[in-house]
Amino acid sequence: MMRCVVYSIAKSSPLELVKIYQKQCKQFDCELELVDLFPKNTANAQKVSKELAQKSYSLAFEPYLNPKAKNIALHPKAQRGDSFAFSKMLENHLNINFFIAGAYGFEENFLKGCQAWSLSEMTFSHEVAKIVLCEQIYRALSIIFKHPYHK
């Protein structure tokens, strides 16, 4: 069974659409899970400085970096591609972790432990980014398994 986990610095997860994609991914034997992390120190760090905020995100995410998994950090200045390129990146991996930072983005050191990927040149709210990411995971699985969803 494949497992994709989306970790984000957020207080709560969206949304009915995410639940639909979670259900649809199961047909490809893929568990799609969302984990929202918002440690107490993050709110304070975000008020103090960008650097402290980024450090708090790294500290929240580091326990979930798995050397046996494909770790992907969503980053606006990273490589991007179409749905086929995204599916190629996911193909042949059983455990995939996605990381969505808070408003100040990632520390460079955290990015060294991940492959960085951008969903778009545009900036999205966390809620929209999660929906787009979940849909693209489902679309990638559809491409990999030659399901008619992706036409």
Curated annotation (Swiss-Prot):
Protein name: Ribosomal RNA large subunit methyltransferase H
One protein family per Pfam: SPOUT_MTase
Catalyzed reactions per annotation: pseudouridine(1915) in 23S rRNA + S-adenosyl-L-methionine = N(3)-methylpseudouridine(1915) in 23S rRNA + S-adenosyl-L-homocysteine + H(+)
Higher taxonomy: Bacteria, Pseudomonadati, Campylobacterota, Epsilonproteobacteria, Campylobacterales
Summary of the function given for this chain in its UniProt record: Specifically methylates the pseudouridine at position 1915 (m3Psi1915) in 23S rRNA.
Organism (species): Helicobacter pylori (strain G27)
Main localisation: cytoplasm
This protein's GO CC annotations: cytoplasm
Subunit structure: Homodimer.
The protein's enzyme class: transferase
